């Protein structure tokens, strides 16, 4: 059985003729600007960049399931760094979902889920066209912020 435990459905609350009380089912209703922030948080910082990085390395290392990659300590460390260290300081908080909690769920529930048959090969499709949106927003946010830290590489022995 394929099952994904976590779900987020954020919809613009704009129904001129009314709507059922779908929030009782967990749907989050908000304004258009917040919906856009949630999408940007997911696509540009807290999920898709992590998935894309795992996909590329998964293809190179011969993995056939994204969930199996999370058992590799080095790959897990890489996506934790992308999410927490690189993304979280500059992500735009949509206010309706906490970015840190979102990344926690992505790294501890969603990506490691063995019942999601996601493959690195599928996610890596058209990676060259995804890079700008997956990583570009984080890079732009760093360049525009004061939290850009640069440490020169130490010489290797």
What kind of feature is each model-predicted range?
Residues 55, 59-63, 89, 93, ...:
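Short, well-ordered loop/turn and helix-capping segments at boundaries between secondary-structure elements
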Residues 75, 79-132:
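Long, amphipathic alpha-helical stalk/connector segments used for oligomerization, subunit docking
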Residues 43-58:
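Conserved phosphate/anionic-ligand binding catalytic regions in large, soluble enzymes, centered on
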Residues 59-85:
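Catalytic phosphate/nucleotide-handling subdomain of diverse soluble enzymes
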Residues 39-43, 71:
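C-terminal, charge/polar-rich interaction regions
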Residues 36-37, 124, 139-149:
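Hydrophobic alpha-helical bundle architecture
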Residues 1-36:
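Primary mode marks residue(s) on the alpha4-beta5-alpha5 output face of response regulator receiver
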């Amino acid at each position: 059985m394929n099952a994904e435990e976590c779900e987020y459905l954020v919809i613009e609350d704009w129904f001129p003729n009314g709507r059922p009380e779908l929030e009782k089912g967990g749907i989050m209703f908000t304004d258009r600007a917040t919906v856009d922030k949630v999408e940007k948080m997911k696509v540009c910082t807290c999920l898709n960049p992590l998935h894309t990085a795992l996909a590329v390395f998964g293809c190179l290392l011969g993995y056939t399931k994204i969930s199996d990659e999370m058992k590799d300590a080095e790959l897990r460390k890489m996506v934790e760094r992308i999410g927490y260290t690189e993304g979280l300081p500059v992500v735009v908080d949509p206010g309706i979902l906490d970015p840190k909690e979102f990344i926690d769920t992505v790294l501890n529930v969603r990506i490691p889920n063995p019942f999601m048959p996601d493959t690195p090969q599928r996610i890596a499709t058209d990676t060259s066209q995804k890079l700008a949106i997956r990583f570009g927003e984080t890079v732009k946010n760093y360049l525009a912020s004061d939290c850009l830290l640069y440490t020169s590489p130490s010489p290797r022995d």
